[in-house]
């Protein structure tokens, strides 16, 4: 399971010209599911995302996590993160989770984070989405479990 996380001042996702999810300070999470992913990997990644210390403390050091700064999550499904780009000029998605598996683990990730008291907004699974953000830093990390 892969999460590309970006520290943002604000982010939103639109579908068909309508904003369906938006946050201010927090993390934009682009979430990719791979074939071998399961509930245990999802929980490990969700915990890591929420606990990752990438927000600045009073000394300007990345020392605080999402909860400590009162931030929110905007979680967007992104199957292309599971692409194999090692050969040729066209990505292979053979390692990506099935749509059914990905949808289930995506929703489980969202529910798990919300159950931990983190405000969560989402995109729409498998929709054509337009994602806008103001990256803070920029600070971007690729987390994988």
From Swiss-Prot:
GO cellular component, one term: cytoplasm
Keyword entries, A-Z: Cytoplasm, Hydrolase, RNA-binding, tRNA-binding
Gene Ontology MF terms in the entry: D-tyrosyl-tRNA(Tyr) deacylase activity; Gly-tRNA(Ala) deacylase activity; Ser(Gly)-tRNA(Ala) hydrolase activity; tRNA binding
One biological process term in Gene Ontology: D-amino acid catabolic process
E.C. designation(s): 3.1.1.96
Motif Gly-cisPro motif, important for rejection of L-amino acids in this chain: 137-138
Record remark: domains: A Gly-cisPro motif from one monomer fits into the active site of the other monomer to allow specific chiral rejection of L-amino acids.
Subunit organization: Homodimer.
Membership in a protein family: Belongs to the DTD family.
Protein's recorded name: D-aminoacyl-tRNA deacylase
Organism: Shewanella loihica (strain ATCC BAA-1088 / PV-4)
């Amino acid at each position: 399971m892969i999460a590309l996380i970006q520290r943002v001042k604000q982010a939103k996702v639109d579908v068909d010209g309508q904003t369906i999810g938006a946050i201010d300070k927090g993390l934009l999470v682009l979430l990719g599911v791979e074939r071998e992913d399961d509930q245990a990997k999802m929980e490990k990644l969700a915990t890591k995302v929420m606990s990752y210390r990438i927000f600045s403390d009073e000394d300007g050091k990345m020392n605080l996590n999402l909860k400590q700064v009162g931030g929110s999550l905007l979680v967007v499904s992104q199957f292309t993160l599971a692409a194999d780009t090692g050969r040729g000029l066209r990505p292979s998605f053979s390692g990506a989770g099935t749509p059914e598996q990905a949808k289930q683990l995506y929703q489980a990730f969202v529910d798990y984070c919300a159950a931990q008291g983190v405000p969560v907004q989402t995109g729409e699974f498998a929709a054509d989405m337009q994602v806008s953000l103001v990256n803070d830093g920029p600070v971007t990390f690729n987390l994988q479990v």
